[in-house]
């Protein structure tokens, strides 16, 4: 079994090794040329999009428009049935 003194010595050598390794790689990365993360700025000028045309080439008929308008009708048109009555219509 490993005693406490040996484990402390092994841990100390391991930490010393990590410190030397860290210092070595820190100096080698600092000696490298810096890497350009972003490229040079674009030379293309930005312009806003053109307004829509006045002619009807872009116009499309929405075939679903009538379906969308009448899609949800919970009751028939007009006043609600049974308002003002004690018993709603159809009650026994």
From Swiss-Prot:
Proregion residues excised on maturation: 31-70, 86-92
Keywords: Apoplast, Developmental protein, Hormone, Hydroxylation, Secreted, Signal
GO cellular component: apoplast
GO biological process, one term: regulation of root development
Region (Disordered): 70-92
Superkingdom assignment: Eukaryota
Signal peptide stretch: 1-30
Upregulation: Induced by jasmonic acid (JA).
Residue positions where Hydroxyproline is found in the record: 74, 79
Molecular function terms from GO: hormone activity
Record note on modification: The mature small signaling peptide is generated by proteolytic processing of the longer precursor.
Described purpose of this protein according to its UniProt entry: Extracellular signaling peptide that may regulate primary root growth rate and systemic nitrogen (N)-demand signaling.
UniProt subunit comment: Interacts with CEP receptors (e.g. CEPR1 and CEPR2).
Family that this chain belongs to: Belongs to the C-terminally encoded plant signaling peptide (CEP) family.
Name by which UniProt lists this protein: Precursor of CEP12
Originating organism: Arabidopsis thaliana
């Amino acid at each position: 079994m490993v005693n406490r003194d040996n484990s402390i010595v092994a841990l100390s050598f391991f930490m010393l090794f990590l410190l030397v390794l860290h210092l070595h790689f820190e100096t080698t990365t600092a000696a490298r040329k810096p890497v350009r993360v972003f490229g040079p700025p674009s030379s293309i000028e930005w312009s806003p999009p053109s307004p829509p045309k006045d002619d009807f080439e872009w116009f499309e008929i929405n075939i679903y428009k009538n379906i969308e308008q009448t899609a949800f009708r919970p009751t028939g048109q007009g006043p609600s049935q049974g308002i003002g009555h004690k018993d709603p219509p159809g009650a026994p």
